[in-house]
Amino acid sequence: MTIQRLKSTDPVSIEGWSWQPFLEDAIKSLGGLNFEPYPVPDRFLQREDQTGSKSKPISVTTATWACKTEKFRQVRAACVSAGSAASVLNFVINPNSTYDLPFFGGDLVTLPSGHLLALDLQPAIKTDEVHTTHVWDQLIPIFERWRDQLPYGGPIPEEAQPFFSPGFLWTRLPLGEEGDDLIQSVVRPAFNEYLELYLQLAASAERVNAERSDFLLQGQRKYTDYRAEKDPARGMLTRFHGSEWTEAYIHTVLFDL
């Protein structure tokens, strides 16, 4: 049964979607922030299609949960459920440039080949110590504790390195009981601890002056432009929903700065 969603903060409930508990954790953590719906066009609130073969069709649901607050320009969750073909939660907090904050990024992906899982507080301007030092001093001890409990996901491309912090937690896990156990015992609490730190940083953040805000905005645009150009979900979403819908979704919802 399809539940009609009329605005971006209406609940996302997708039967069998594996990342539902993570989204519920995240929304609960935002509960005290007096958030309001972020404007998302109706056609991107929830879409259903089919993939697979004619003899073995697979139902696909892609939904968007999104809000905004005084300090967060956009908080959004891209949720994809496609049975054994894919299960995805991409949860991102885009701060307002009037506050000196990194991005929060949680990318949780299950494919037929395994789980690809990444968490970070991503810098808008990695070379700016005022922007990064106080974040990394608190993030790295958290990263080191969880990193030791997960296999390393492998190197990231050199061109992407300006957009990741030293606390980038990145792992690949196998399908099955071993991976599922690590997701519940390590990845989920790590996700919540990264998010808790981010919200603490936001709570103490104070407005910056106009010059600093413009500087941060330039860095944020470089980040969102890079993410829009290199979005690894582009191929999957195009296969599920077509090129026109996918490009519009990437540029007008996911990375709309």
Curated annotation (Swiss-Prot):
EC identifiers of the protein: 1.3.7.3
Enzyme class label: oxidoreductase
InterPro entries assigned: Ferredoxin-dep_bilin_Rdtase, Phycoerythrobilin_Fdx_Rdtase
GO biological-process terms attached to the record: phytochromobilin biosynthetic process
Domain of life: Bacteria
Keywords: Oxidoreductase
Gene3D superfamilies: 3.40.1500.20
Assigned protein family: Belongs to the HY2 family.
HAMAP family assigned to the protein according to its UniProt record, in alphabetical order: PebB (MF_00793)
NCBIfam families according to UniProt: PRK13249.1
UniProt function note: Catalyzes the two-electron reduction of the C2 and C3(1) diene system of 15,16-dihydrobiliverdin.
Name of the featured protein: Phycoerythrobilin:ferredoxin oxidoreductase
